[in-house]
Amino acid sequence: MELLAKTRKLNALLQSAAGKPVNFREMSDTMCEVIEANVFVVSRRGKLLGYAIHQQIENERMKQMLAERQFPEEYTQSLFNITETSSNLDVNSAYTAFPVENKELFGQGLTTIVPIVGGGERLGTLVLARLGQEFLDDDLILAEYSSTVVGMEILREKAEEIEEEARSKAVVQMAISSLSYSELEAIEHIFEELNGTEGLLVASKIADRVGITRSVIVNALRKLESAGVIESRSLGMKGTYIKVLNDKFLHELAKLKTN
């Protein structure tokens, strides 16, 4: 397959995504096919975002690593020493993707490391490995193009996470601000009693202990539930089951108490 055809194959994957998140596993599969190498997309912390195997490596440690989708911490950190594409590293290199305990089996193993950079920061690493055949310029062009695409996708995901976090925080703040003074007091006592993100409590007992009416507790819970911050369900005589749905809620509630 010529370079242009291989590039088009990668482009076809991006176009088929049509604005949706690119699946790192599919991306790895396509890279594996066009570059004809084992492909590992590794995050900054060593998480295996995606991988595809062209040549099986029979090694228990490698199998466990793939099953756990996590690269060793020491190896992951060492990858940051590589700031530009390093190709055709042999099995004696500290950066080899082949198991060092089986060097004699993978004497012809070659590894190429491509930094994934976006927004001026290191986002991860693309690791390619194959036996025998050297990585040529065409392979490196495809690898660097792929790393750019992966970098853009990681940046997009990070931006979405930040946006979602801000939205969750805003929802919580609005829900809390909708509570009256007595309702807020009731909620503080409820979650002191709950001491976690979910559990069972008896509203009447809290009302009696704090000196507020049960209706205040019911109204407060209803407001938080309608905002999607919590889920509550009456279990009759047993009490009320409460579960926090928004992970920003308890943090914002704690901030109010310290102010």
UniProtKB/Swiss-Prot annotation:
The keyword Nucleotide-binding applies. The modification Phosphoserine is found at S215. Residues 203-222 bind DNA. Keywords: Activator, Cytoplasm, DNA-binding, GTP-binding, Nucleotide-binding, Phosphoprotein, Repressor, Transcription, Transcription regulation. Autophosphorylated on Ser-215. Autophosphorylation may regulate CodY activity. Disruption phenotype: Disruption of the gene results in strongly attenuated virulence in both mouse and guinea pig models of infection. Disruption leads to a delayed initiation of dissemination but similar kinetics of subsequent spread of the bacilli. The mutant cannot grow on heme iron as sole iron source. Disruption alters the expression of more than 200 genes, including the toxin genes. It also causes a decrease in AtxA protein accumulation but it does not affect its transcription or its translation. It does not affect either ex vivo or in vivo capsulation. Pfam families: CodY (PF06018), HTH_CodY (PF08222). It comes from the Bacteria. One of its GO terms (cellular component) is cytoplasm. Residues 1-155 are annotated as: GAF domain. It is found in: Cytoplasm. The keyword Transcription applies. GO terms for molecular function: DNA binding; DNA-binding transcription factor activity; GTP binding. One of its GO terms (biological process) is negative regulation of DNA-templated transcription. DNA-binding global transcriptional regulator which is involved in the adaptive response to starvation and acts by directly or indirectly controlling the expression of numerous genes in response to nutrient availability. During rapid exponential growth, CodY is highly active and represses genes whose products allow adaptation to nutrient depletion. In B.anthracis, CodY represses or activates directly or indirectly several hundred genes, including genes involved in amino acid biosynthesis and transport, as well as nucleic acid metabolism, the pentose pathway, the tricarboxylic acid cycle, acetyl coenzyme A synthesis and oxidative stress functions. Among others, represses directly the expression of sap and eag, encoding the two surface layer (S-layer) proteins, by binding directly to their promoter region. Binds to a 11-bp non-palindromic consensus DNA motif, the CodY-binding site. Monomer and homodimer. Belongs to the CodY family. HAMAP family: HTH_type_CodY (MF_00621). NCBIfam families: codY_Gpos, PRK04158.1. This is Global transcriptional regulator CodY. It comes from Bacillus anthracis.
